[in-house]
């Protein structure tokens, strides 16, 4: 057979690996370890798409490579299976979310196995398994005991269509929910919060120790948002009330001409005048309908209402009006700001909108035209006049502290993590609220608190989760007769994914989250591969939980993931009309190399776009595996371009990868394999071993495959193939195309064993040196010949070879040779007359 029969070979080796537990995690303590982690998927009803295997193939290549290098490799897979989609589907169809999830997992697992990934399935985890979420609940009880899990009445992002509140991070810039695109409104509710802010400084500082993309670290730094400045206290005129503002520029206090409170600020109702009460109430209602992102959009029109009250500027005693405006958030800082319109563009626009005073306190701009936001020497600032920014800040902070109306302060943009969901399909929060007003955590001996099975999973309508409908589960009685009620909120999907990488290390332990010695052996994760969309949410939450567990002495490292890599996106093919509107692929026909709209006949422009059901451009890996084979899909996705680049899917590229694998198959099965080395492939083979090794280490898989192609081209020019080079080449291609490699290994090595643990080939540096070199022959200063000669020949040998060359002899025929100048490894210059 002259081609690679993937339909026979791939299932054969997948069966072998499963039967022999080929990829069971090594436990030899004398070996180094390598922990390769994929971001585990949510098992949706749609199954895998071709974007999933890109990251999975990358970690699989590394895992297979490290096994061959003698490492114990931990390469696991599991399921992030709680969450809204399964529950929404169950509500829409009447099906059990547990059954739906189990079916989806089975389908995902089938698809993953068909791609030949070397996962240790003995370590599979599922966040919906009570044996797993027992430990999610255990972590929560520890957070509760340490005061890091607490209840608070907070304004939440309420999504009526989902019947639940969502975290700030789950609200899109347009004010809709990330899940479903539903409207989000602000609503005060009793919620569980996790005090991630207690770890803000450590989460910020420890980023410097991580081998992560700088863009991801910057996103986390910005989300944590450390600011150094001062808290300043403003008294409310004619009352005993006061409020605090945080400012990074206390030196501009003399330019503060009004203050702004968040509409939800606790002082608003108390200080609002009778005349302004109706306007303030209306504005507060309108603000409650907007998300935080919509409220803080810099481009939106400035709105606000005066409360009728005045604050006293502590530095000059001036009375300045107190406004409310929705761009100030109660959840950020103190919920109050001092406005310096001369030097802040948003304040300037607000002042212009409502005809408020603008007082310049930094020289250098024309504050009537726009806010001057650069630095300058202070003016109109009494004892700060003439000072620069740094000196003025130091002086005003000292003054505020001396007068008792302010102090230096460090704040963070980071808010505590909203941890409750009013849904059924999530981990029950293990807390009981007693009728005597106390609350206690469910004892560890009673964990897991199992999610009760019910068909009635619709939201309760009261703002509580459907668990509030389940009286038998809900109501409990203490030994002393005191009645209690279980917490009805469930945990968000982020809970189970915040620590799953730890459970892989010891997935069947019934006594503890994981064994201490095993955690010491495997942590930190050596490489974590997944999408950049998880930069803030999952990665920040996982770091927080890990640091908390470090403080408890559960884990031995400060950070969970030493190296992070974000793969790019695989884009689909799409088509645009003359307006730029996207056209679904089933509305497109190809004629003479161009693309046309089936209905209108308009010629369309082909362009890459994110794969989506609506555009009908989603590529199913099952179809690719059926037609081309799993190895082709793996090689193609790694050869498309750099791993972190976003690149359009190409059927032609897929076919090219398949042709390459067929050439590999023919090379090994058709060439005569020799026990003796004739030296013809010494250089290219050793170059290939070196290049592929180095490029796998640096995740440059596309250039590694390109080098494998170079070797195949060179080897095909030879009649025979040295057996050690054939074996070495098969080992080099094995991480990329493991099924093909296993099959070819049997034909060459004839051991009957898997190639998986055969030692990785090495290269001989001496063979990388060129044996031959090109020299030029000049006659009368003009190049007349180029000759390949052995390296480092003497002058005499070079001269002899040059004069014997037929071209040279023809040029000097009948002429007298005056002089021959030979420069070893460079040229021969012949002077004639």
From Swiss-Prot:
- Give the matching PROSITE patterns: AA_TRNA_LIGASE_I
* Range of residues in the leader sequence: none
Question: Which CDD domains does the protein's record reference?
Answer: Anticodon_Ia_Leu_BEm (cd07958), LeuRS_core (cd00812)
Q: Where does ATP bind?
A: 613
Which GO CC annotations does the UniProt entry carry? cytosol
Q: What does it catalyze?
A: tRNA(Leu) + L-leucine + ATP = L-leucyl-tRNA(Leu) + AMP + diphosphate
Keyword terms of this UniProt record:
Aminoacyl-tRNA synthetase, ATP-binding, Cytoplasm, Ligase, Nucleotide-binding, Protein biosynthesis
Motif placement: 'KMSKS' region: 610-614
Q: Enumerate the InterPro entries for this protein.
A: aa-tRNA-synth_I_CS, aa-tRNA-synth_Ia, Leu-tRNA-ligase, Leu_tRNA-synth_edit, M/V/L/I-tRNA-synth_anticd-bd, Methionyl/Leucyl_tRNA_Synth, Rossmann-like_a/b/a_fold, tRNAsynth_Ia_anticodon-bd
What Gene3D superfamilies does the database record attribute to this sequence?
HUPs, Isoleucyl-tRNA Synthetase, Domain 1, Valyl/Leucyl/Isoleucyl-tRNA synthetase, editing domain
| Compartment list | Cytoplasm
Question: Recorded GO terms, molecular function?
Answer: aminoacyl-tRNA deacylase activity; ATP binding; leucine-tRNA ligase activity
GO biological process terms, semicolon-separated: leucyl-tRNA aminoacylation
For this protein, the record's PANTHER family field holds: LEUCINE--TRNA LIGASE, MITOCHONDRIAL (PTHR43740:SF2), LEUCYL-TRNA SYNTHETASE (PTHR43740)
Question: What is the protein name stated in its UniProt record?
Answer: Leucine--tRNA ligase
Tell me which species this is from.
Answer: Streptococcus pneumoniae (strain Hungary19A-6)
């Amino acid at each position: 057979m002259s081609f690679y029969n993937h339909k026979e070979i791939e299932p054969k080796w997948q069966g072998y690996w499963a039967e022999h537990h080929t990829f069971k995690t090594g436990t030899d303590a004398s070996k180094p370890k390598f922990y390769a982690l994929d971001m585990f998927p949510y098992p949706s009803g749609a199954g895998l798409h071709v974007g999933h295997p890109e990251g999975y193939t990358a970690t699989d290549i590394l895992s297979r490579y490290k096994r061959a290098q003698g490492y114990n490799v931990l390469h696991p897979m599991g399921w992030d299976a709680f969450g809204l989609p399964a529950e929404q589907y169950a509500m829409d169809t009447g099906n059990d979310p547990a059954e739906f999830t189990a079916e989806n997992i089975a389908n995902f697992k089938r698809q993953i196995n068909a791609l030949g990934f070397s996962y240790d399935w003995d370590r599979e985890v599922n966040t919906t398994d009570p044996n797993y979420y027992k430990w999610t609940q255990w972590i929560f009880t520890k957070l509760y005991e340490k005061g890091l899990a607490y209840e608070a009445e907070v304004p939440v992002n309420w999504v009526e269509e989902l019947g639940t509140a969502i975290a700030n991070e789950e609200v899109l810039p347009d004010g809709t929910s990330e899940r479903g695109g539903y409207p989000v409104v602000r609503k005060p509710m009793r919620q569980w919060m996790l005090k991630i802010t207690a770890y803000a400084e450590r989460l910020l500082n420890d980023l410097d120790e991580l081998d992560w993309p700088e863009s991801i670290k910057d996103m986390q730094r910005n989300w944590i948002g450390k600011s150094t400045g001062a808290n300043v206290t403003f008294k409310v005129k004619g009352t005993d009330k006061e409020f605090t503002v945080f400012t990074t520029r206390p030196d501009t206090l003399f330019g503060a001409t009004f203050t702004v409170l968040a509409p939800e600020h606790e002082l608003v109702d108390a200080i609002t005048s009778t005349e302004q009460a109706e306007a303030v109430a209306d504005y507060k209602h309108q603000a409650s309908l907007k998300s935080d992102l919509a409220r803080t959009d810099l481009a939106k029109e400035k709105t606000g209402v005066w409360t009728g009250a005045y604050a006293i500027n502590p530095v000059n005693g001036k009375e300045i009006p107190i406004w409310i405006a929705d761009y100030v958030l109660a959840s950020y800082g103190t919920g109050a700001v001092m406005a310096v319109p001369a030097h802040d563009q948003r304040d300037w626009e607000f002042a212009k909108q409502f005809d408020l005073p603008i007082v310049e306190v930094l020289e250098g701009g024309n504050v009537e035209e726009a806010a001057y936001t650069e630095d300058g020497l202070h003016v109109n600032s009494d004892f700060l006049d003439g000072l620069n920014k740094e000196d003025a800040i130091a002086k005003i902070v000292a003054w505020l502290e001396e007068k008792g109306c302010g102090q230096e302060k460090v704040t963070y943009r980071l808010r505590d993590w909203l941890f409750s969901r009013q849904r059924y399909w999530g981990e029950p929060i293990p807390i009981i609220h007693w009728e005597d007003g106390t609350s206690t955590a469910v004892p560890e001996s009673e964990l897991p608190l199992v999610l009760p099975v019910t068909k009635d999973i619709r939201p309760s309508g009261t703002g509580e989760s459907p668990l509030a409908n389940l009286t038998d589960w809900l109501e409990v009685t203490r030994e002393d007769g005191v009645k209690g009620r279980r917490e009805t909120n469930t945990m968000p999907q982020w809970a189970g994914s915040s620590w799953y990488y730890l459970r892989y290390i010891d997935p069947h332990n019934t006594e503890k989250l994981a064994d201490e010695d095993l955690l010491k052996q495997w942590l930190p994760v050596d490489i974590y591969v997944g999408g950049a969309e998880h930069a803030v949410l999952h990665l920040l939450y996982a770091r927080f939980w890990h640091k908390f567990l470090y403080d408890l002495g559960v884990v031995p490292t400060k950070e969970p993931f030493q190296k992070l890599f974000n793969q790019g996106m695989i884009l689909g093919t799409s088509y645009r009309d003359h307006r730029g509107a996207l056209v679904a692929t089933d509305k497109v026909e190809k004629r003479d190399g161009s693309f046309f709209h089936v209905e209108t006949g308009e010629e369309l422009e082909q362009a890459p776009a994110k794969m989506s059901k609506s555009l009908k451009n989603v590529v199913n890996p099952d179809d690719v595996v059926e037609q081309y084979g799993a190895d082709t899909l793996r090689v193609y996705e790694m050869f498309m371009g750099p791993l972190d680049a976003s690149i359009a899917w190409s059927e032609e590229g897929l076919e090219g990868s398949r042709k390459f694998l067929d050439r590999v198959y023919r090379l090994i099965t058709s060439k005569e394999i020799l026990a003796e080395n004739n030296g013809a492939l010494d250089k290219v083979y050793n170059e290939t071993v070196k290049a592929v090794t180095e490029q796998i280490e640096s995740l440059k898989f596309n250039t590694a495959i390109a080098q494998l192609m170079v070797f195949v081209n060179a080897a095909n020019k030879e009649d025979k193939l040295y057996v050690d080079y054939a074996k070495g080449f098969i080992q080099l291609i094995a991480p990329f195309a493991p099924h093909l490699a296993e099959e070819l290994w049997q034909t060459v090595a004839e051991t009957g064993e898997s190639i998986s643990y055969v030692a990785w080939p090495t290269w001989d540096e001496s063979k990388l040196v060129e044996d031959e070199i090109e020299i030029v022959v000049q006659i009368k200063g003009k190049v007349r010949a180029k000759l390949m000669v052995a390296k480092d020949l003497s002058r005499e040998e070079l001269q002899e070879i040059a004069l014997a060359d037929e071209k040279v002899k023809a040029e000097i025929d009948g002429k007298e040779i005056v002089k021959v100048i030979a420069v070893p490894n460079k040229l021969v210059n012949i002077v004639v007359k």
